[in-house]
Amino acid sequence: SVVPFYKLTSLPGNGNEMISELEGMKMSGYTMADITGYWEQDNENGTGFYIDNEGNVSDLTCLYGVEKYYSVKYHSAEVILNGNSCVISSLGSQWMVYAVGSNSLLAIDRNNNSLQVEHFVKKDVPDEMMRADEIMKAPVPAGLLGKWETIHYTRMINGENVTDIDILNGDDWNKQFYHTLAFSENHKISKWDRFGSQLYDQCFMLKGDNITIAEDLTNLLFPKYSYTETWTISDKTENSMKLTREQDNTTECYTYKRK
């Protein structure tokens, strides 16, 4: 008997779409425009990276609390684009781009000996990334930058002074209040004790006269899941500044001088 042979004219499932996309993918001559945007690994883990127009890479990891949200590691690396080679460093991997299209990116992790090709899908930029961009690109006023040294501390409860002291370097009791702050352009705030030991290296954002401080950028984005402090610049000159915080019936105020 004769078994008729029919020419294969289509592929099952979304195979035709995949073949069509592969035919249109670039495998060399990459430009920055080819890879900008948010790319998420096609494994349902919600892990991906965002590349801006300047080639800065930000890592995003999906977390689950009361709701789904993304942690952001802002500008953790820069794309290496050299001729026909494109390498994207993200979360410990060095992704060497094999091919890129309008909605798909294929890459091999140079840090993994298996040389397995991984698929990334282009998706809408998560809100967390856009908010992180807004925070980190907001200019820090020049008058706030640099180091500030505590010289006075007050604490009031129900409007009455409980503590009202000058900060003296030689007073052991006062050392609990003494610290130096440093604000930097990259929205980092560092804190030292009076002996010069660094206590904290945190992140901050500005909104009007309010400074909100958290352990890192992700905690700034989601204060309900983490501890944050918000201080108000209640008075400011070129070389002095007061930071005030109100909590319930308690008001704290630190007076600083420029160091």
Kindly label every feature range from the protein language model.
Residues 3-4, 20, 37, 118, ...:
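Hydrophobic residues positioned within well-ordered beta-strands of beta-sheet architectures
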Residues 10:
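Extracellular glycan-recognition regions
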Residues 156-173:
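Mixed-charge, low-complexity intrinsically disordered segments
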Residues 1, 42-50, 56-116, 154-156, ...:
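Contiguous, well-ordered beta-strand patches that form the walls/edges
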Residues 121-123:
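Short beta-strand edge segments in extracellular beta-sheet folds
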Residues 251-258:
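Short, low-complexity, Pro/Ser/Thr/Gly-rich segments in the mature regions of secreted, periplasmic
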Residues 13, 21-40, 127-149:
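N-terminal helix-cap/turn-to-beta initiation motif at the start of protein domains
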